[in-house]
Every structure is written in C-alpha cells, then in structure tokens.
C-alpha cells in the first residue's frame, strides 16, 4: 500500500531523527533578516547564517520539511504552474543538514538507505541513477564501491553553463561564499515514457526525474574566484515532497498525488466544474497553497514587493475560477480543505484560518468587480489584432486600469496562441516592476560582513553596568587590533549589559570607559553570537584585550522597558477587543514611542481604540507581576505563549508573563510590574497595507506629556472662542454654523457676479459661419465658476462655441462649451485638448463640455488666439 503525502513527510523526518538529527520546524515563508531573498525557496534558507559561520546552533545535524514559494524574481515558476506536471508556486522541501559534522560518506549512505530500505521507501535500486560533479572522484567512488551502483548509472556532469564551476552539479551561495559539488539522485519511470538520462540530449523528457540533490559545501569562494577549502565541510540536501510522493504513489504527475487529488476535488466542488482534467483546477489547487501560507506568514496583498506577488497569484486563481464558471467568491472556501489535507504541516494555518479566509475573500471581491470589464477590453483588443502579438501598451493599460498582472494577460493570450510584447510592457512599467520583483539569489558578499568567532554573554537582564574585556574591534567592517580617539568602530566584549536590537526593541546606548578612554555607544547590534557596540571613541585609545566598564544609559533603558511591556499588554488587549485573528506583524519599541503592526481588516472604530486603551490601563492599575521563565519551545506553545512574527527561536525560549493577562515568547527587557508603566495612551491608528493596521502609543512620562498637551490645546481653543472647556463643544458648533451661513452668502454673491460677467461677455461673441464664437481670459474668477458661466452663455447665445480661461497662482484652468446643434462638427473635448496642449496641460470631457488644466500661463494668449482658426476650419 502506497504512503500518503503526510506519511511520507513524517517518515523522512523520523528516519533522520533516528540518525541523530534535530527535527526543526519549517521557518516562515518571509525570510528572517535576509533582504537578498524575496521568499523562502529552499530548506537551507533558515540555516544560511549557520553555514556562513555567523550563527551557532546547539545541534550539528538537522532535518526539516520546509515550506517554500517560487513565484517572482529568479525562481519564477508562475507561468508554468498548471501547464506542466511538476511546476508549483508552493512546495515542501524535505532536507537533512550537517553543520561540520558528517560529510559525503554518511550523506550518501543515509540517502540510499532511506530510498531503498524495505523499512522506509523501498524503491527498486535498479531504477535509481546518480550524477556527480565531473572532478568529484570521492563521491563517484562512494556511489560505485560502497553503495554498489553500476558505472553506467553514475554520470559525471562538467561545467555545462559556460564558465568554471558553472554546472548543474556545482552549487554556490552567491558570487562569493560557501560552495561545492553536489550529487543528484534520479528515478527512472521506465521506457514507456519519453526521455533520456541526465546529461543526454533527451534529458528534458519525463522518464528520468530528479528526486534528491545533495550538496557538499567544502569550499569558500573568494572575490578573485579562488576556492579555499572550508575547515569544517557541511552538507545541505533537498528533496521535493511532491516529487517523491509521485514516485512512491506510482504516478507521473505531481498533480495526481493524494494531496492534489483531494484539493482538485475541492476546487471542482466550489466552482461547479465537472471535468477533473481541466488545467484550471490544477492552477487553483496549487495557488491556494501558496496564497494561504503566505498570508498566514504575514504577507498581505498590495502593489509592492511580496504583497504584489501574492496579489498576482490570487488574481490568477480567481481568473481561472471565472473560466470554470464560478459565479460567486470561491477561493477562500478552499482554506478549510487545504488545512485538512496538509495534516501536521497545516497547524499554523489552522490557527489563523479566519484571518486568511477574510483576506482572500476581500481580495477576490475587489478583483471580481473589475475582472469582467478587463476581460471584455482584452477580448476587444484581441479581436482587432492582426498579428500574433499583443502590444505592451495594451498589457500595461490592463494592469494600470483593471489590476491585471501581465502574467494573467499572458495566460489569456496563451490560450489563443497569442504572445504578449513583454519588453513593451516592461518599458511602460519599469518602476513598478523594479519594486515588485526583487533579486532572489544570495547576492550579498558575506565575506565583507563582520564575522566574529567569539560569543558575548548578555547580562543586561540583571545589570546595567559591569566590567568586560574587548574581544574584537572592527572599523569599516574589518577587524583591527586598536582604535584611536575620533574613530568610529564596533566593539565586541566577552560580556555586556547592553541589549542588542532584536524582536522590535532597539539596541541600548551608553558608554564604554576606562582610566584613559571613553567610547560613546550609539547603537548595539548582534553579529552571530557576538554583541557589537557601535559608536565613536571620544578620548584615548582602545585595543583588543583591554578591560572596560560598560555602562548602559539607565534612563533610556527604563523608558524602553515600559514601552516594551505596554506592547505586550496592548497585543493581548487587541485580541480581546477585536478578536483572536489579531496577530503581531511587526513592532518598534524605543525610548519615545511604541509602534505595533497587527492583522485586522478594517480601521478601528473610536470606541474600539478607547476599549483597548482602557483595558491596558486596567492591567496597569492591577500592578501585575511581570515574570520570566525559561522552557522548551513546545512547552511554551502548549502554555499558550504567543510567538513574534518573523522571529527565529531556539529550542529553549524565554516566556514572559503578566499575571493572567498576557503570555508571550520574548527576549526583550521589561518592567518589574505592570504598575511601573504608569499610564498608556494611543496616539494614532492607521493602515500600512491590506489587512494590516498600525498603532502608535506612549507610556509613563510620555503619556502624561500628551495629556498636558491636549489640555493646553483645549485651553487655547477655549480662550480663542471666549469660552471655557465646559461649553467648548457648543461654542465650536455655533462657529461652524455661522461659517456655513457666511460661505453660503459668499457663494451667492459669486454666482451673481459671474452672471453679470456672463452678460457682459456675451456681447464680445463673434460670428463664424453662423455660429457664435466666444474666447476670453478672465481675471479674478475662481476656476469652479467657469462652468456656471459657460452654461449661462450657452443659454444666451444659442448656436455657440465658448472657450474661457483663468489663471490662479500660475496654473491655467480652461473650459470649452459647445451647443448641442454644433457637436457634430466641433467637439468640446477635441477643442480643449488642442488649447491645453499649448499651455503644457491635458484634459477632456463630453462633446458639449470639456475642461483642462495647464502650467504655462505665458503661452495662454497665443493658445486662445489659435481657437478662431481651428474652429473656422472645422465649420467650413
């Protein structure tokens, strides 16, 4: 009996756990602290700093089932999804990793045992082929002599990409950094399927499918291209769960595995489709996975960066649902079936199900309003098309007006064998594309980063000053032995009370000092396991090995502690007032303010803001104890501790509790009791992206200062209105009513003046072929009065063409009016466009009335003078 996808995932993890590997949970799809990467796209992403020597773990062997997304940037599979057997936007990468522990021998033996042992995957040995890098004799011999694979099934792959080490079988993290040869394992589906072994001209066929890639990181590539052997070689492997499931379930397409069969049936049910072979079902089944998990990991649909990629995927799915005949919103209904089919890998998603469904539903409803009109416009353009390519300008117009991503337009065109001029589209939309598509590789030169082998012990929970020793100094990213007065540097100590920026809390400031020197610390940051004090040596000199006294700015730290504790109280209060869908999406805690981003689909009502504020202040008055406990991560989650979005946690974590009101994982610094906070006030609530709100708040002395400021403003307003704070609202209402009355009277006077001006103007009209033409520049007339004047003049003049202009603060306002009986010969929109072009502007409107603006007031007289000749030509 074949294993289910969930069973295969668990078997992989169980196998490597039995081989001494730590089972590590999948990291977020949003890479932590890695601006070089759009989405997590491989199992090794969360271990990148470990491989680079910037981070240390308490284990040297790990195994994961990592959620990955490839859509956008270098790894863009979107346009192929649904049309091929193995392309996905979302997939799970099974992997095992060695950080300086085992190397080639064990890595290969582990892979062979898992794949072929009757206890595990039990694949026929004769169906497995392998490739190795051309010069990797060690791997070749292990496969041949120890594993026993015949030579004809071991293929050496050289530099097949046009440069040294540019090979399918040589992996590198970037232009510099860790790299090394890899060996890949292929499964032969049999001669009933077309295709040849890897390295052959027919390798693109579907007969031989790569199922596992094992990378041997044994070199550090320098900027000049030289390869230095790594002191502790490592192993990074990746096997696509969906691919190995297809092999083990004896199907040739990933979309035929149990997971996708179930999802496809769910898609058919919510869309009303009956043909289960329809490619649109595959597209939607794939896309619900990437969309749901991206939203669960904090990405919201938007027009920038990750949010734009998410929006593209959602809209592509909705369009395919439209093709299947879906009559109402359907996409969000697939979140439940997805959770069911993902098993243990869907637990994070289940906790946020309501929020994910709401975001998908809202986005689909917004897009549905324009989808029909956009498709109609595209159909119209395709009907007019004489060749086989849609121009880029039309593709851009569809994006700009209807929100059609270009790949959605390309999808529609592809079904009709029509290409899209993507170069033309890119030219029209270069800036948007630059923002939306970030580089997706490991492009940063990590050799230039500060790398510290030593670790710093943080003692700032209990101390604000202590003595330490300088273990490293860096100037401009380079290690030095000493610094002198006036130099900016990063100072690393063996132990420190300074808190390094983490979890939204800013780094400490303060001073490092000794008998003959003073170093002003302006920021504190982490460098792997070391803590770096960033600042400037104010006096004296400092060298590695010197003893220092480290003093944190105590008053600043105290204000930060209050703000951080208030952030936890507010998070819990938001979940009580708004609902448990609220989860933290980001935060900033400094000594002046706390800023908190959270998931919520609409602006908070004033009464909700007040309720949160009151609830937090109630907890402050309760003077709850703030306690910390160190425990296992799983135990903390079982206790209900909330985790911070985007943070990485060790297996042992710090749990912060405030009585019975709040429990969160947190490594920051906090007050001793909630009463220390004193007072909490929300000063703003706003939106930052679709489905994400932001609150800014102040505490303690800062909150009291805002109370005083509000009181002072009220007193000032009361004084200006000659009242007091008790009757202030009545006074304001009275002033507003008087203002409205005066504005009404002023408007009446303006209309009377305009009517009089119109009467005076009518006598200036001239006759052009039986039509009255009036062209005039007016001074002292508001632009919005021009329309009223044109209406009056049309009533007075009968068959007429009118052009009026006025200049206010250097800006030209134009209006053209044409009586109905003349619009067959002269259209107001064309006339105003001709005039506006001459004054550096543009405009438009109906055939009988059109408006425009311009910036070149000096050109106005000549532009108005050109009207008579233009009109005369039209009326001939």
From Swiss-Prot:
The modification N6-acetyllysine is found at residue 74. Its cofactor is Zn(2+). Pfam families: DHHA1 (PF02272), tRNA-synt_2c (PF01411), tRNA_SAD (PF07973). Acetylation at Lys-74 decreases the alanylation activity for tRNA(Ala); a protein that is fully acetylated is inactive in vitro. Changing residue 564 to A: No effect on tRNA editing. Residues 553-705 are annotated as: Editing. Zn(2+) binds at residues 564, 568, 666, 670. It comes from the Bacteria. Its main location: cytoplasm. GO terms for molecular function: alanine-tRNA ligase activity; aminoacyl-tRNA deacylase activity; ATP binding; DNA-binding transcription repressor activity; identical protein binding; peptide lactyltransferase (ATP-dependent) activity; protein homodimerization activity; Ser-tRNA(Ala) deacylase activity. GO terms for cellular component: cytosol; membrane. InterPro entries: aa-tRNA-synth_II/BPL/LPL, Ala-tRNA-lgiase_IIc, Ala-tRNA-ligase_IIc_anticod-bd, Ala-tRNA-synth_IIc_core, Ala-tRNA-synth_IIc_N, Ala-tRNA_ligase, Ala_tRNA_ligase_euk/bac, DHHA1_dom. CDD domains: AlaRS_core. Keywords: Acetylation, Aminoacyl-tRNA synthetase, ATP-binding, Cytoplasm, Ligase, Metal-binding, Nucleotide-binding, Protein biosynthesis, RNA-binding, tRNA-binding, Zinc. Binds 1 zinc ion per subunit; it is not clear where this binding occurs. Residues 766-875 are annotated as: C-Ala domain. GO terms for biological process: alanyl-tRNA aminoacylation; negative regulation of DNA-templated transcription. It is found in: Cytoplasm. It catalyses: tRNA(Ala) + L-alanine + ATP = L-alanyl-tRNA(Ala) + AMP + diphosphate; (S)-lactate + ATP + H(+) = (S)-lactoyl-AMP + diphosphate; (S)-lactoyl-AMP + L-lysyl-[protein] = N(6)-[(S)-lactoyl]-L-lysyl-[protein] + AMP + 2 H(+). Residues 2-461 are annotated as: Catalytic. Belongs to the class-II aminoacyl-tRNA synthetase family. Consists of three domains; the N-terminal catalytic domain, the editing domain and the C-terminal C-Ala domain. The editing domain removes incorrectly charged amino acids, while the C-Ala domain, along with tRNA(Ala), serves as a bridge to cooperatively bring together the editing and aminoacylation centers thus stimulating deacylation of misacylated tRNAs. The editing domain removes incorrectly charged amino acids, i.e. Ser-tRNA(Ala) or Gly-tRNA(Ala) become uncharged tRNA(Ala) and the amino acid. It is specific for the acceptor stem of tRNA(Ala). Homotetramer. HAMAP family: Ala_tRNA_synth_B (MF_00036_B). Catalyzes the attachment of L-alanine to tRNA(Ala) in a two-step reaction: L-alanine is first activated by ATP to form Ala-AMP and then transferred to the acceptor end of tRNA(Ala). AlaRS also incorrectly activates the sterically smaller amino acid glycine as well as the sterically larger amino acid L-serine; generates 2-fold more mischarged Gly than Ser. These mischarged amino acids occur because the of inherent physicochemical limitations on discrimination between closely related amino acids (Ala, Gly and Ser) in the charging step. This is Alanine--tRNA ligase. It comes from Escherichia coli (strain K12). The lineage of its organism: Bacteria, Pseudomonadati, Pseudomonadota, Gammaproteobacteria, Enterobacterales.
